[in-house]
């Protein structure tokens, strides 16, 4: 199984997993990590993006039969102040994954910082053009899927509403399940038929996100 654990401490898993980290230059700002049972063949931490390249936002590991990529997509910020940078990032990340997929199947997981469709957040009308639900970000995610990738959760549950992976700390949002689905497992289309399960572990606490899970035969 492949998992994304946003808040699990490395010491808890040290004895069982190989740890691969990608750090931001700015201490405490951002970063990604992958814990794997096997040593990767190679690790890629930069994607040639003109923005956010020193923020530890990608941790890509090559294994014998596939690429596994953990990503933390830049947030567009209040008022979409960082939207232009976000669009540059989305374009480069899409190209990066597409290049990897030419070699072997790709699994990409992480915080993509976008609710793709109205079903993916509780209040789409009042959040329209807010960061994470702007037309531009949603179109960018559509282009990523169109480049040859499958949203594993929606493949299995195309009509499931009220399934979220992030909740604001304000207004008892998690208790009321006023959330967003912004954490995904994407699978290259050539391997999408091997997906056997996808879950959102919303009973697991530790941050404003919860883990997401993919089961796939690779």
Model-found features: residue ranges?
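Short, small-residue-biased leader/transition segments that mark boundaries at the very start
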Residues: 2-10
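Internal alpha/beta domain cores that form substrate/cofactor-binding pockets in large enzymes
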Residues: 9-20
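Generic structural signal for well-ordered secondary structure
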Residues: 12, 25-28, 36, 52-54
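A generic structural signal for short beta-strands and their flanking turns/coil linkers
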Residues: 15, 29-31, 57
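A short, structured active-site edge motif that brings together acidic residues
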Residues: 20-29, 47
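Short, charged, surface-exposed secondary-structure boundary motifs
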Residues: 27-33, 141-142
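Active-site regions of metal-assisted phosphoester/phosphodiester hydrolases
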Residues: 38-218
């Amino acid at each position: 199984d492949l998992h994304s654990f946003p808040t699990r401490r490395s010491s808890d898993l040290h004895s069982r997993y190989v740890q691969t980290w990608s750090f931001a230059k700015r201490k405490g700002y951002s970063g990604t990590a992958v814990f794997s049972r096997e040593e990767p063949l190679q690790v890629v931490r930069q994607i040639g993006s003109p923005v956010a390249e020193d923020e530890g936002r990608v941790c890509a590991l090559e294994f014998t039969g596939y690429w596994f990529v953990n990503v933390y997509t830049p947030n567009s910020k209040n008022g979409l102040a960082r939207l232009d940078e976000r669009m540059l990032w989305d374009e480069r990340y899409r190209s990066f994954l597409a290049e990897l997929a030419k070699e072997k199947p790709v699994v990409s997981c992480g915080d993509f910082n976008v609710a793709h469709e109205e079903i993916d957040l509780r209040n789409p009308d009042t959040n329209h053009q807010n960061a994470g639900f702007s037309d531009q970000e949603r179109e960018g995610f559509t282009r990523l899927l169109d480049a040859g990738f499958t949203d594993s959760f929606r493949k299995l549950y195309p009509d499931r509403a009220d399934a979220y992976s992030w909740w604001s700390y304000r207004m008892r949002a998690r208790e009321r399940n006023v959330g967003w689905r912004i954490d995904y497992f994407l699978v290259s289309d050539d391997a999408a038929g091997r997906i056997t399960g996808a879950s959102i572990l919303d009973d697991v606490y530790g941050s404003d996100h919860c883990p997401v899970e993919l089961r796939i035969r690779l």
